[in-house]
Amino acid sequence: MEQVSHASSITPAQNASIPLEQQREDFKKNRFIAMPLAGTVVWALLGISAPFVSELTITWLLYIGTGAIFYLGAGLSYLTGERFFAKKAAKNSFDRLFFVGMIMSLMVFAIALPVAAIDHTTVPLSIGILAGLMWMPLSWAIEHWIGYFHTLTRTFGIVAAWYLFPDARVEAISAVIVAVYIVSLITLERRFQSIKSN
């Protein structure tokens, strides 16, 4: 979900002299929907396919699918206008902060993988929660409630689904994640349109 800044005429060397508050204001102007769109598509496909494949297959699909979210999001960013890898786009400190937050979330997989080796049914629980953690620093950076809502609702919803639907965990957890993504996408797009109109 790394975003590009609208201050495209600023070079990285010049960026160091821009006050953090100005960098934050530039960062807040981003749309932020490419990655959630990718996540929605992937988790919907995982939930739909789960009843028709073996437990081993869905476990692999969870790893592969969630790993593909970044690449799908990067591709979608060219359709949404976010253009993650545009050469003229200036990156700022908040882009880097979000990227570091994403790496931090991925490092927690060091806990999830050994646990999954003991009990593969924990994979949708752990991946679903870990992948949602990066919304917290985003919420702080853009000074908007949606990231906090996303992480908290997703986490509690996933835990509830994991306990309430032991025979359909992937389907239930996917449904929770997709529902939270839909709310997040609508909110982010409304936020972006509001910023654009001002």
Predicted segments, located by residue:
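Helix-coil boundary and interhelical linker segments in multi-pass alpha-helical membrane proteins
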Residues: 47-61, 111-122, 162-171
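Terminal transmembrane helical module of multi-pass membrane proteins
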Residues: 147-198
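Structural signature of hydrophobic alpha-helical transmembrane segments
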Residues: 60-72, 113-129, 175
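Short, Lys/Arg-rich, polar N-terminal cytosolic tail immediately upstream
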Residues: 1-28
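Selected alpha-helical membrane-embedding segments in polytopic membrane proteins
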Residues: 40-97, 103
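Alpha-helical transmembrane segments and their membrane-interface exit regions
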Residues: 67-75, 129-138, 178-188
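Small-residue-rich segments of transmembrane alpha-helices in multi-pass membrane proteins
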Residues: 41-43, 95-106, 153-165
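Membrane-proximal helix-loop-helix units in multi-pass membrane proteins
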Residues: 108-156
